[in-house]
Design a protein with these regions (language model features):
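Short, high-confidence coil segments that cap the C-terminus of an alpha-helix
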Residues: 5, 35-36, 112-114
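Glycine-rich phosphate-binding P-loop
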Residues: 10-23
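Conserved catalytic-core segment of NTP-binding enzymes
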Residues: 32, 108, 115, 120-200, ...
Length: 218
């Protein structure tokens, strides 16, 4: 784990593979190392109106995990009520997600914190507007990537395709997390062993169902 000012992008092999759980745990781990750490979710789809503001549950978890005081608008520049693809949710309310606006918010957070942990929405290539995907945002911010693999049937293919996409974009896959979201998966150890052999990046945590991640340095 780098101890200087830096940032990481958390992506996943699919939606609902535990990105927020892992991102929040990583933020807590960084705080325990004596660092100022803050989470960011640039685009969130799926929120409830609370005291006149749309709040996304993932964003709330990221805020709770960190130790940096920052405005909600910086941590979550774009939030939409329906839990649908971000670019569709944005279109329904006449909004176009701007990478420049996200960059500005990120820069402010990076000035405040030692580490910014940026969590994506959905998978690596999820569209955020009609021309750009989450991958374009990561390229713009030049962030090293941590891949959360939801360990279930089909995860090897999903993980290898996502890792290939990350590297094809010229980005650095600095590590991956085996998140055992299906504890009853047949041949689970063999699947994880295959991932360790083929992903060509360190497994920074192997998370059993219902347990807290134990990160290794990376």
């Amino acid at each position: 784990m780098q101890k200087n000012k830096t940032a990481y992008f958390i992506t996943g092999t699919d939606t609902d593979v535990g990105k927020t759980y892992i991102a929040s745990a990583l933020i807590k781990y960084l705080c325990e190392q004596g660092l100022q750490a803050v989470g960011m979710k640039p685009v969130a789809a799926g929120a409830e109106l609370v005291s006149g503001r749309l709040l996304n549950s993932d964003v709330i978890e990221l805020i709770k995990a960190g130790n940096v005081d920052a405005d909600l608008a910086l941590i979550n520049p774009y939030v939409f009520a329906p839990a649908i693809a971000p670019h569709i949710a944005a279109e329904k309310v006449g909004v176009t997600v701007s990478l420049d606006n996200i960059q500005q918010a990120f820069d402010v957070l990076q000035a405040k914190a030692d580490v910014v942990v940026v969590e994506g929405a959905g998978g690596f290539r999820v569209p955020i507007n009609h021309e750009q995907t989450m991958a374009d945002l990561v390229v713009k911010l030049t962030l090293p990537v941590i891949l959360v693999v939801g360990v279930r049937l089909g995860c090897i293919n999903h993980a290898l395709m996502t890792a290939g996409s990350i590297r094809a974009a010229g980005l650095n896959l600095v590590g991956w997390v085996a998140n055992r979201i299906d504890p009853n998966m047949p041949a689970i150890e063999e699947n994880i062993a295959t991932l360790k052999a083929m992903l060509k990046a360190p497994c920074i945590a192997d998370v059993a169902w219902g347990e807290e991640p134990q990160f290794i340095d990376f």
